[in-house]
UniProtKB/Swiss-Prot annotation:
GO terms for cellular component: NADH dehydrogenase complex; plasma membrane. Keywords: Cell membrane, Membrane, NAD, Quinone, Translocase, Transmembrane, Transmembrane helix, Transport, Ubiquinone. PANTHER family: NADH DEHYDROGENASE SUBUNIT 4L-RELATED, NADH-UBIQUINONE OXIDOREDUCTASE SUBUNIT ND4L. It is found in: Cell membrane. GO terms for molecular function: NADH:ubiquinone reductase (non-electrogenic) activity; quinone binding. NDH-1 is composed of 14 different subunits. Subunits NuoA, H, J, K, L, M, N constitute the membrane sector of the complex. This is NADH-quinone oxidoreductase subunit K.
């Protein structure tokens, strides 16, 4: 059986990869994927702690986090399509003004 520490370590590694992806990359699509990786790593930690304590609270919270993440992806992709149509790029450095 895999210990809770292994799950937490994996979650921390995935979260760190997500933070590095958001800070280093300039492509909006990669930044969205990195944010999703960070949310999923938090979900993994919640599930691990929920499993260790034999309670279902972490699983319930994870379900709501997944629902909010789905809404975030829908809004984010709509914004991305709008920005791409206006600027013809997905590079975040090229989109520095609010003017169309």
């Amino acid at each position: 059986m895999i210990s809770t520490n292994a799950y937490v370590l994996l979650s921390a590694i995935l979260f760190t990869i997500g933070v590095v992806g958001v800070l280093v990359r300039r492509n909006v699509i990669v930044m969205f994927m990195s944010v999703e990786l960070m949310l999923n790593s938090a979900n993994l930690a919640l599930i691990a702690f929920s499993r260790a304590r034999a309670e279902s609270d972490g699983q319930i919270i994870t379900f709501f986090v997944i629902a909010v993440a789905a809404a975030e992806v829908a809004v984010g992709l709509a914004l991305l399509v709008s920005i791409f149509r206006a600027k013809k790029t997905t590079n975040i450095d090229d989109v520095n003004t609010l003017k169309g």
